[in-house]
């Protein structure tokens, strides 16, 4: 349901723009133009950085976001990490309460989860970093993992800003179900299920076994082009066109 602030904003709006169809549907009763625009991506992520990996025979999988958030599907994420000891999982984002932002708290389950990540020999925790450092780090990855519990997720698995940042690298993305990309298997691989991530570990394993094909030059080009078409400057131009 819409909050009071959202209702008040809609009453005075001449135009409603959102990154998800689901949000636009909530405003169906308001008779003003409505437009869907995807998340944008900054030039930092579209820039090409030199590859600095020294272990090219080892697969590196990236994950970015506040690791203290309760809507991460922690059991599934830890299962995937445990089942793939030869893969390095690099995580960017807060994992200490003092560095956290909205949506994270150091309760017992969260501490247990973070401790498991810290103890895992194939996990690297970079913590919160500046945008340019994150962008450069993501470009070193071979694949990306998104693993949220849709039932707890504040966006309910509709769209995530980080997807565009991952797409900008061209590398394959394995994710929980995301409605905004439900018909774009060329951009993101995801299970069909919306109520659980039970099939995500197997999808991850299958993708990694065939990572060369998923990261072919053609596939990488498709992902990069999609991200480039959603750069912030183009999104601003699109919004200006609606006004």
Tell me the role of every PLM-derived stretch.
Residues 93, 103-138:
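Nucleotide-activated donor-binding/catalytic signature segment of Leloir-type glycosyltransferases, i.e.
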Residues 195, 202, 212-243:
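A charged, aromatic-enriched C-terminal amphipathic alpha-helix characteristic of glycosyltransferases
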Residues 132-137, 145-167, 174-185:
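Nucleotide-sugar-dependent
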Residues 1-16:
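Membrane-proximal helix-turn-helix segments that form the acceptor-binding/catalytic region
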């Amino acid at each position: 349901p819409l909050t009071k602030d959202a209702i008040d904003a809609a009453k005075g709006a001449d135009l409603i723009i959102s990154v998800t169809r689901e949000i636009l549907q909530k405003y169906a009763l308001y008779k003003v133009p409505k437009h869907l625009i995807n998340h944008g991506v900054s030039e930092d992520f579209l820039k090409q950085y030199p590859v600095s990996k020294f272990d090219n025979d080892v697969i590196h999988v990236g994950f970015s976001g506040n690791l203290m958030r309760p809507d991460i599907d922690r059991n599934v994420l830890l299962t995937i990490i445990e089942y793939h000891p030869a893969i390095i999982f690099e995580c960017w984002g807060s994992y200490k309460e003092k560095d956290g932002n909205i949506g994270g708290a150091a309760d017992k389950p969260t501490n247990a989860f973070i401790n498991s990540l810290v103890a895992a020999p194939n996990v690297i925790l970079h913590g919160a970093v500046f945008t340019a450092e994150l962008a450069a780090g993501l470009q070193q990855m071979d694949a990306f993992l998104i693993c949220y519990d849709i039932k707890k997720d504040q966006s309910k698995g509709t769209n995530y800003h980080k997807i565009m940042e991952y797409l900008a690298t061209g590398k394959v993305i394995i994710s929980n179900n995301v409605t905004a990309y439900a018909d774009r298997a060329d951009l993101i691989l995801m299970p069909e299920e919306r109520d659980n991530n039970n099939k995500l570990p197997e999808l991850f394993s299958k993708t990694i076994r065939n990572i060369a094909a998923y990261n072919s030059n053609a596939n990488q080009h498709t992902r990069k082009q999609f991200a480039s078409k959603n750069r912030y400057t183009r999104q601003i131009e699109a919004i200006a066109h609606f006004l």
